[in-house]
UniProtKB/Swiss-Prot annotation:
Residue positions binding substrate: 49-51, 89, 197, 248-249
Organism: Leptospira biflexa serovar Patoc (strain Patoc 1 / ATCC 23582 / Paris)
Lineage, opening ranks: Bacteria, Pseudomonadati, Spirochaetota, Spirochaetia, Leptospirales
Assigned keywords, A-Z: Amino-acid biosynthesis, Isomerase, Methionine biosynthesis
Domain of life: Bacteria
Listed name of the protein: Methylthioribose-1-phosphate isomerase
């Protein structure tokens, strides 16, 4: 039976209410986003994250920007709003596609009030479409699993649930759909360093819904595949090139290689907006580099007073350097299938499946 889901993005007509994912699971706190500038900070600082959720939030952000203006618009100012939001997080293609569509929808619209209404309507439309796409994707993915098997053990990476989308989720959407079909699902959630989206967010979502879940460290998947029967690895993604190379949260590539070695099917769950047919291979996907302090002191984790839980020198020597790419590229050869709202298909079929969409 379907369970209630989170609504991490809520539009309140004059402001945007965002569930602050930086403070989960400690507390459920909503940010009241009043301006485009606050939206950009929320995206950049990962109060909201996940490619679909970022895209929706970005369109609400430019809506807020337009609402603060008055009189007649001009193309330069419209482009400025769009450019500022785009630069908040460049890897996920969903945001880029959404902003291009937003620009197209206001061509010939000359008043800021009218532009704000067009963008507000578009953002609300995106929320409905994303939820519907995720629910269809989830069912398509669930149908890949054997009907005569009642229990499945699945590894996930990062957070790909309702918190990362308008609802239901992509990879976690498949898990929810299996649950709704009456199957027992045991989830092994990679903690996903350094931002800990798996241990903080995926485990939180699964526990809220009563789905059995174990947190594992990012280096534990090989041991797990050797010692327990793993039926599949399910991940989301931020951008897919034409050849199937896939950008996703750092650590995905490692997990794909381990799954390949152990003959565990590795599935990428993505809505059509995550496919970028302008890019031939993953080498063309830009990789966002984030702050070193996210690695050396978990600087996104703060106590009630707003102070760092792990001050400098606590988890790494003071002055230690770190690399912090937010994403890596998983080569297409490690991916068994893409699970989408359009159906499930192998990397070689991407051009055929997406060219007329």
């Amino acid at each position: 039976m379907s369970q209630p889901e989170f609504l991490p993005i809520q539009w309140k007509s004059t402001f945007l209410s965002l569930l602050d994912q930086r403070v989960l699971p400690g507390k459920k706190e909503f940010l009241q986003i009043q301006t485009m500038e606050e939206t950009i900070v929320a995206i950049r600082e990962m109060a909201v994250r996940g490619a679909p959720a970022i895209a929706i939030t970005g369109i609400f952000g430019i809506t807020l920007g337009a609402k603060k203006k008055s009189g007649n618009s001009n193309p330069v100012d419209v482009d400025s709003l769009i450019k500022q939001v785009f630069e908040s997080r460049p890897t996920a293609v969903n945001l880029s596609f959404a902003l291009k569509e937003a620009k197209k929808r206001v061509e010939g619209v000359s008043h800021w009030d009218s532009i704000a209404k067009v963008w507000e309507s578009y953002a609300l439309e995106m929320m409905v479409q994303d939820l519907k796409a995720n629910q269809t994707l989830g069912k398509n993915g669930a149908d890949l699993f054997p009907k005569n098997q009642n229990e499945f053990h699945i590894i996930t990476h990062c957070n790909t649930g309702a918190l990362a989308t308008a609802g239901h989720g992509t990879a976690l959407g498949v898990i929810r759909s299996l649950r709704d079909q009456g199957k027992k699902v045991v989830v092994y959630a990679d903690e996903t360093r350094p931002f800990l989206q798996g241990s903080r967010l995926t485990a939180f979502e699964m526990m809220e819904e009563g789905i059995e879940c174990y947190i594992i460290t990012d280096g534990m998947s090989g041991w797990l595949m050797n010692h327990r029967k793993i039926d599949a690895v399910l991940v989301g993604c931020d951008r897919v090139a034409t050849n199937g190379d896939t950008a996703n949260k750092i650590g995905t590539y490692n997990l794909a290689i381990v799954a390949y070695e152990h003959k565990v099917p590795f599935y990428v769950c993505a809505t059509k907006d995550s496919f970028d047919l302008k890019l031939k291979t993953g080498d063309e996907i830009p990789i966002e580099m984030r702050k070193e302090s996210e690695v050396t002191q978990f600087d996104f984790l703060k106590n009630e007073e707003g102070n760092f839980l792990f001050p400098e020198g606590k988890t790494s020597p003071i002055g230690a350097r770190a690399l912090n790419p937010s994403f890596d590229i998983t080569k297409a050869k490690f991916i068994k299938n893409f699970i989408t709202e359009l159906g499930c298909f192998v990397p070689e079929e991407i051009s055929f499946r997406l060219k007329n969409v």
